[in-house]
Amino acid sequence: CKILNQDLESVSIYLYEDFLKAYDDLRATQKRKEGGVFYTPKSIVDMIVSSLDELLKTKLNKNKGFNDQGVKVLDFATGTGSFLASVFEKIISKESEVFENEAIKNKFLKDIYGFELSFVPYIVARLKLGQILRKNGFVNFSDADFQIFLNNTLDLEKIANFDMFMPLENLDTEWKKARDVKHSQDLLVILGNPPYNAKSKNKGEDILELLKIYKQGLNDKNIQPLNDDYIKFMRFAQWKLLEQNKKDLFEEKKGLLGFITNNSFINGKTHRKMRESLYKSFDEIYILNLHGSDKDAKNDENVFDIKVGVCISLFVKYKDEPSNGAKVFYYSTGDNNIFSRKEKFALLDDVRQKGLNAIKWEELSLDEPYFWFIKREFKNKEYENFWALASDKAEDKKSIFLNYSSGIQTEKDNIAIQLNKQSMENVLKDFKNLTKEENVKKYNLDNSIILNTLTQYENNTGFISKIHYRPFDIQWTFYSEKQGFLGRPRYKTMQHFLDKENLGLCFIESSIHDYFSHSIVCSNITDGNFFGFRSFTAPLYLYVNNEKIPNFTSEFLAYKENHKILKDKSPEEILYFIYANLYNPRYREKYLEYLKTGFARINFEVEQKTFDDFATLGKKLVELHLFKRDLKDEIDFIFLKEDKKANFKIEKYQEKDRFIDNKIILNEDLAISPISAEIWQFTIGGYQVIKQWLKYRNDYECSKEELEHLLKMCKVIKETINLQKELNDY
């Protein structure tokens, strides 16, 4: 009673953000962050609810919005009931003497549904909704009357299968009621904040069958993003609203969906069939992109305490005939210079008060095969006929490299990747000398992984190797073609770097940033997260039966053979030309929108002089990035104290203390200078190169060679910037 007399929202936040975490820890269940479950701020909830109320009136002729008879609502991921509470409050705010009306009583207790999997928020939701009604003078009800069911939304089986602990005796009754909602009730509105979890454990046959429409026709190497829980929840809602219980093939069901979710589906290349399905199912779609990813602008705050970007999406089906393709309306906070959480909440509050027209929506023009739900302007159509670095599964167009793959994937980077060779040897010695229990406790690895790695080590079927871990950051791993603590060794591609002289190119499939700097040369095996997300590697040569052959597709070899310039060029010269293009600022800017959609493409239809100039500059860049060029520059170590103490430790500093007055501060005794802001901020992929190198070595005692590598890295970056300026003149 004491709790219920306190402010409703603060109680709910406390229970959901603190008690629920402790409860889950106690039960040893999956952590909230892994499951993607977070309390939804009220500004978000109220904006979605008010927008749906508006659309009910303007699009579905429900003049009273949620108050209208026959408007049945489901929150498919109820949590502590914030969305349903907002619906309750919306209904109450529009009714005088609300509880004297039996129809309104039925609205609360018969037309509003919720599904929740976790016990604690399920209880909190009932308490919250009960308190709202009691505060408004209605007491003739029980919390048990609410249609909120302890249930997994994605479990669509018609026969119960209870394989989890539940502190309720009437779980069977709960399940039957939820099943009735899923399979029998017609809903008009589905809303909520579904969990985001890329490693989804929801693998029921029914939901996977429904999900096939989002995967149909895809031949991408990795469609794992489509298995995220939030994607499954969206597919469930689409099916429930528009497809389930159709009387006949020609019936067009109507309704609304309103969610806040991970925003990966609006511009993910793998999500193109999902977007196509939504586009062809609804009449109108509204996408409010709130951004907030740690890969977005540095000052772009998330509306949640998470690192993935989010968006609000509203889906509307109101016409009597099948959709001919939705009108898609888009608004981006980033494009409108709205970056702080406070500003984003203010925008949402404005929409809540003034309606959807408070936003200046931009109608998108969607094209096959991608159906982007974001603003994209493709002006330079000639790019589409260039040669892709690798095979583009979406468009199946001409490509250069035959053998390529994403880089190595470890089971745990902090174990499988070490800063120096000795540290890697120490890990392997532990695997050999410690007991099973000691190893599992120290390294938190499954014992089978430890045994596999140890077997490879003792049988000499693996070896300690350098690895291109991050840009200009070569570290160490234990490599074997079989799985150990390298979960995916990518041997088919990586074998061509093992004890063999080779060059390779690291690149990405599409940029997730508003810039492109995602390519670098390599000469060793590479990490799969090289640029901060999925990264690919293509060797220049393949070693087949002791023969060294160029790693080019048959189509590109035929093109090369008949090309007036390429026919006389070596694979190295072609790589140099490619590399110069990828580092050309003008190329990066001109084709940025295309570089966000697929593997980078290269134009070989150039004049002889242009090719030769680019190949010359590209060769310099390749040698530079492999640290094979001698650089004479004023950048050097400087001592910060008169005693000139030789201190090789990288002290842990905040960025404001790390880079001061054109100096990189390594510790209280040593710095590198002069370093311009341009050098310090130089970025490859998702990493600020120098900053990231230092971050991996906080509180680490460097060798002299490691510090010399850092010094040379600064010089390499400076010269790279100079060469890029030369390229920009073309």
Task: State the predicted function of each range.
Residues 7-288:
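SAM-dependent methyltransferase catalytic region
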Residues 3-4, 26, 707, 727:
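Extended hydrophobic/Leu-rich segments
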Residues 201-206, 210, 220, 238-730:
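Sequence-level detector for compositionally biased, low-complexity segments
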Residues 3-11, 225-226, 565-573:
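Structural motif
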Residues 3-7, 36, 579, 609:
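A general boundary/transition motif marking the beginning of the first structured unit of a protein
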